[in-house]
C-alpha cells in the first residue's frame, strides 16, 4: 500500500494522506473534514 494525498473539492487544500491499495484503478473519494472550510466536504485523490 502507498499513501496518496486527498484534496478538498471546495478550497483545493491538501488535507490528508491516506493509504491506498495499488490494485484499485479508480480514484479515491472520501467525505472528510476540511479545517479551512470548517465543514465536511468531498476529498478526491490527487496525483
Curated annotation (Swiss-Prot):
Swiss-Prot/TrEMBL keywords: Ribonucleoprotein, Ribosomal protein
InterPro entries, per the entry: Ribosomal_bL33, Ribosomal_bL33_CS, Ribosomal_bL33_sf, Ribosomal_zn-bd
Signal peptide range in chain numbering: none
GO BP annotation list: translation
Source species, domain of life: Bacteria
GO annotation, cellular component aspect: cytoplasm; ribonucleoprotein complex; ribosome
Gene3D superfamilies: Ribosomal protein L33
Cross-referenced PROSITE patterns: RIBOSOMAL_L33 (PS00582)
Keyword GTP-binding found: no
GO MF, any single term: structural constituent of ribosome
Pfam families: Ribosomal_L33
Family annotation (SUPFAM superfamilies): Zn-binding ribosomal proteins
Disulphide-bridged cysteine pairs: none
NCBIfam families hit by this protein: PRK00504.1, rpmG_bact
Family label: Belongs to the bacterial ribosomal protein bL33 family.
HAMAP family: Ribosomal_bL33 (MF_00294)
Protein name in the entry: Large ribosomal subunit protein bL33C
Organism for this UniProt entry: Staphylococcus saprophyticus subsp. saprophyticus (strain ATCC 15305 / DSM 20229 / NCIMB 8711 / NCTC 7292 / S-41)
